[in-house]
């Protein structure tokens, strides 16, 4: 392995190690939090988190989440010289709210599988899944409000503001599906960036801000690390949009082009439609002809036109730009060199994701 592949592979290796370390740090407290829920909600929460099967059989262990957000919380705290234990409440809280959002997203999107098995609503019913998501959200706030959590009032405020911003982003994303594909009222690149900064960037910003806050950081340090999280969140969303169109089914669990077939306004398509190119015009005509709901027969042509109009390249360039802005946000912030290396690795890992 030579050239760019070498550093990229090393960054991936470091980031995966950071995430695994973060999950090992939070798992005991995460399990203790879930145990505080009513028995049936705890069962469904543990099922969603990959701890056991539908009936509570621990032998049926599924894949757990990557723990990206807790990893960022720990790194932010370590950047300011705090021991990891100071950041545990924040790391647990962001993992809980992330999973709350996933449970509810699966309902809204009608997704029937996650991490290789039925989603919570598919397994237990919509009402039960809604309660499960609600329970995870309440546990997150309760974890930060606990008496032993330092600066707990500020911590809860940070979390709830991050979630409010996330809700704004989700609402925008939902509204986008009712907008025309092109012409007056179509989703613009500026609309997309605002929604991505809220929908995905806000919680990653909350994760890094919580780590800095619980480490005793001042306003400038918290703001710098929050900006890192927000920018890398947008980069992550841009990369995710590329994967949603061209990612291999073996890696994503979804058919190639699934985002486009479901009518989602993702960055490659928005950029292609705004390109003013012949390919972009042909893509717009195709989408209008099929009212934005493309079947298997139309998808290959739509993907080819999106790429020919520069949509894929634009999304990848935006991901790189946001990644560079994230790294610039913490460039002047004093921190241990190994922590800086791990932050850089996480930035590359979240931007150059497997397709």
Regions found by a protein language model. Give the residues of each.
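Conserved N-terminal diphosphate/IPP-binding helix and adjacent helical/loop segment
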Residues: 1-97, 103, 107-122, 171-187, ...
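Short, charged, amphipathic alpha-helical segments
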Residues: 17-20, 157, 226, 317, ...
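All-alpha helical catalytic cores of prenyl diphosphate-utilizing isoprenoid enzymes
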Residues: 31, 35-39, 60-66, 131, ...
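A glycine-biased, small/acidic residue-tolerant capping/turn segment at secondary-structure junctions
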Residues: 41-45, 112, 243-252, 280-287, ...
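Alpha-helical phosphate/pyrophosphate-handling elements in metalloenzyme active cores
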Residues: 43-93, 139, 143-146, 189-232, ...
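Short acidic/histidine-centered micro-motifs embedded in hydrophobic/aromatic stretches
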Residues: 44-48, 93, 110, 158-162, ...
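Divalent-cation-assisted or electrostatically stabilized phosphate/pyrophosphate-binding catalytic cores
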Residues: 61, 114-136, 182-199, 223-227, ...
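C-terminal helix-coil-helix/basic helical segment that borders enzyme active sites and/or dimer interfaces
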Residues: 78-81, 211-220, 246-250, 284-289, ...
């Amino acid at each position: 392995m030579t050239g760019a592949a070498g550093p990229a592979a090393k960054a991936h290796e470091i980031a995966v190690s950071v995430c695994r370390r973060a999950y090992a740090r939070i798992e005991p407290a995460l399990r203790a939090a879930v145990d505080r829920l009513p028995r049936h909600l705890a069962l469904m929460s543990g099922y969603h988190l990959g701890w056991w099967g539908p009936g509570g059989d621990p032998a049926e262990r599924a894949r757990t989440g990557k723990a990206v957000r807790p990893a960022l919380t720990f790194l932010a705290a370590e950047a300011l010289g705090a021991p990891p234990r100071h950041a545990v409440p924040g790391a647990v809280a962001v993992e809980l709210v992330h999973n709350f959002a996933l449970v509810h997203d699966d309902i809204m999107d009608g997704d029937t599988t996650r991490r290789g098995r039925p989603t919570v609503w598919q397994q237990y019913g919509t009402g039960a899944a809604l309660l499960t998501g609600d329970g995870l959200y309440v546990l997150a706030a309760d974890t930060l409000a606990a008496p032993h959590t330092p600066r707990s009032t500020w911590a809860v405020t940070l979390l709830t503001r991050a979630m409010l911003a996330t809700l704004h982003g989700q609402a925008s994303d939902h509204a986008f599906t009712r907008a025309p594909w092109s012409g007056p009222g179509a989703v613009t690149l500026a609309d997309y960036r605002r929604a991505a900064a809220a929908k995905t960037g806000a919680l990653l910003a909350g994760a890094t801000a919580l780590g800095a806050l619980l480490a005793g950081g001042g306003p400038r340090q918290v703001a710098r690390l929050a900006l890192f999280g927000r920018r890398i969140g947008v980069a992550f969303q841009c990369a995710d949009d590329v994967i949603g169109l061209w990612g291999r089914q073996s890696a994503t669990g979804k058919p190639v082009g699934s985002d486009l077939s479901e009518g989602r306004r993702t960055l490659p398509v928005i950029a292609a439609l705004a390109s003013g190119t012949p390919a972009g015009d042909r893509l717009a005509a195709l989408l209008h002809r099929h009212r934005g709901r493309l079947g298997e027969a139309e998808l290959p042509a739509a993907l080819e036109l999106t790429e020919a109009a520069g949509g894929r390249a634009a999304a990848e360039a935006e991901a790189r730009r946001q990644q560079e802005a994230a790294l610039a946000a913490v460039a002047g912030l004093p921190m241990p060199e190994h922590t800086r290396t791990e932050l850089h690795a996480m930035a590359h890992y979240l931007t150059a994701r497997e397709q």
